């Protein structure tokens, strides 16, 4: 018995592809990205990409391993990537946002999974994005062991996509960094960012809309767009080196909320951070944004990293050695403040 088909009087067969989902394109993407994923593999990764689940053995060197997880996206920085067709590095941003977060608790990133969603899959663009994700995983020393590509017709405008990532790391139970040991007179170090990283882009895009900006608009020796789309710096290798050499009391990844809101997240009761903004060089990009957007100083400090992508709190006797270790690992670092006693009615941070 043949079912009637009043909605399709010509009786042309319909398919998943004609409905907007191309399974073959998804399979081609998987084959394209396998070589990139293989370059990220660690010996603890069991199996490869393409299975229903990804397997990873906890490294045997840990006595009391504690798993640390983090998930994040790239936010509206993606909109600039679409507008200027810069897809090759946005995946680095995706990895950085999660691995830097779990690093704050002392964790070594182990593996990463990604989620790529679009209305219509463009294999070339998706390949560029995942290649960037793999690059970020290599920088972080973690394995890209799986992910999901979701082609969902009608969900996203043509040429646009969304990204999310998920990282898992491990730390010895007795070496978890939670800020509880921070005391008066400890030193606050700031490690340079590579730009806005992946935060504040809704404000950035508003500022761009209010000004005449072209793809070749200059900002010193680079273009404004290049400066804005510089990928988020990954601090994993340099900070793991530091943590192996010295006891780090606290770390803060300067993301949404800027310096004003992220540093207090790692401070125990009874202390506050006093930061001297004259101690580091604020990149000219932030000057441009503040000037062209008429953005108040406090708003800048609570939205952008203002040139500091990661904060380290360390005992005074270890501060100079920490600066040298980070410098030798390729970081630009400044002593930007100190920990002071806090009265109950005072703010947990002052940026002078």
From Swiss-Prot:
Q: Which residues form the signal peptide?
A: none
* E.C. no: 6.3.3.1
Compartment(s): Cytoplasm
Which catalysed reactions does the entry list for this protein?
A: 2-formamido-N(1)-(5-O-phospho-beta-D-ribosyl)acetamidine + ATP = 5-amino-1-(5-phospho-beta-D-ribosyl)imidazole + ADP + phosphate + H(+)
Q: Name one GO biological process term.
A: adenine biosynthetic process
Gene3D superfamilies named among the record's database cross-references: PurM-like C-terminal domain, PurM-like, N-terminal domain
Q: Does the keyword Membrane apply?
A: no
Q: Which SUPFAM superfamilies match?
A: PurM C-terminal domain-like, PurM N-terminal domain-like
User: Which pathway is this protein engaged in?
Assistant: Purine metabolism; IMP biosynthesis via de novo pathway; 5-amino-1-(5-phospho-D-ribosyl)imidazole from N(2)-formyl-N(1)-(5-phospho-D-ribosyl)glycinamide: step 2/2
Q: Which UniProt keywords are listed?
A: ATP-binding, Cytoplasm, Ligase, Nucleotide-binding, Purine biosynthesis
Give the matching InterPro entries. Answer: PurM-like_C_dom (IPR010918), PurM-like_C_sf (IPR036676), PurM-like_N (IPR016188), PurM-like_N_sf (IPR036921), PurM_cligase (IPR004733)
List, in alphabetical order, the Gene Ontology terms for molecular function in this entry. ATP binding; phosphoribosylamine-glycine ligase activity; phosphoribosylformylglycinamidine cyclo-ligase activity
- List the GO cellular component terms: cytosol
Q: Which NCBIfam families match?
A: purM
Q: Which PANTHER family match?
A: TRIFUNCTIONAL PURINE BIOSYNTHETIC PROTEIN ADENOSINE-3, TRIFUNCTIONAL PURINE BIOSYNTHETIC PROTEIN ADENOSINE-3-RELATED
Tell me which family the UniProt entry assigns to this protein.
Belongs to the AIR synthase family.
Q: What is this protein called?
A: Phosphoribosylformylglycinamidine cyclo-ligase
Annotated source species = Nitrosomonas europaea (strain ATCC 19718 / CIP 103999 / KCTC 2705 / NBRC 14298)
């Amino acid at each position: 018995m043949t079912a009637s088909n009043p909605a399709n009087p010509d009786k042309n067969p319909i398919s998943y592809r004609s409905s907007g989902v191309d399974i073959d394109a998804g399979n081609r993407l998987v084959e394209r990205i396998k070589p990139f994923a293989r370059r990220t593999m660690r010996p603890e990764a069991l199996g490869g990409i393409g299975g229903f689940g990804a397997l990873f053995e906890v490294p045997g060197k840990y006595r009391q391993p504690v798993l640390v997880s983090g998930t994040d996206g790239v936010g509206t920085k993606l909109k600039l990537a679409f507008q200027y067709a810069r897809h090759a590095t946005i995946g680095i941003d995706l990895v950085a946002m999660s691995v830097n977060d779990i690093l704050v608790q002392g964790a070594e990133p182990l593996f990463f999974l990604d989620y790529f969603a679009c209305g219509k899959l463009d294999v070339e663009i998706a390949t560029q994005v995942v290649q960037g994700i793999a690059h970020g995983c290599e920088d972080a020393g973690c394995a890209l062991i799986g992910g999901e590509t979701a082609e969902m017709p009608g969900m996203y405008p043509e040429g646009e996509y969304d990204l999310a990532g998920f990282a898992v790391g491990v730390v010895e139970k007795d070496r978890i960094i939670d800020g509880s040991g921070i005391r008066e007179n400890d030193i606050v170090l700031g490690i340079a960012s590579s730009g806005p990283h992946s935060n504040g882009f809704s404000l950035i895009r508003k500022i761009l809309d209010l000004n005449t900006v072209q793809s070749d608009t200059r900002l010193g020796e680079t273009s404004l767009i290049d400066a804005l789309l510089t990928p988020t710096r990954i601090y994993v290798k340099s900070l793991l080196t530091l943590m192996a050499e010295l006891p780090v009391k606290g770390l803060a990844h300067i993301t949404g909320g800027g310096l004003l809101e992220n540093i207090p997240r790692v401070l125990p009761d009874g202390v506050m951070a006093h930061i001297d903004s004259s101690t580091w060089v604020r990149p000219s990009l932030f000057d441009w944004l503040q000037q062209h957007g008429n953005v108040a100083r406090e708003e800048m400090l609570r939205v952008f990293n203002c040139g500091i992508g990661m904060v380290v709190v360390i005992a005074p006797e270890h501060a100079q050695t920490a600066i040298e270790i980070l410098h030798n690992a390729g970081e630009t670092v400044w002593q930007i403040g100190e920990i002071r006693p806090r009265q109950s009615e005072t703010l947990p941070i002052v940026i002078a």
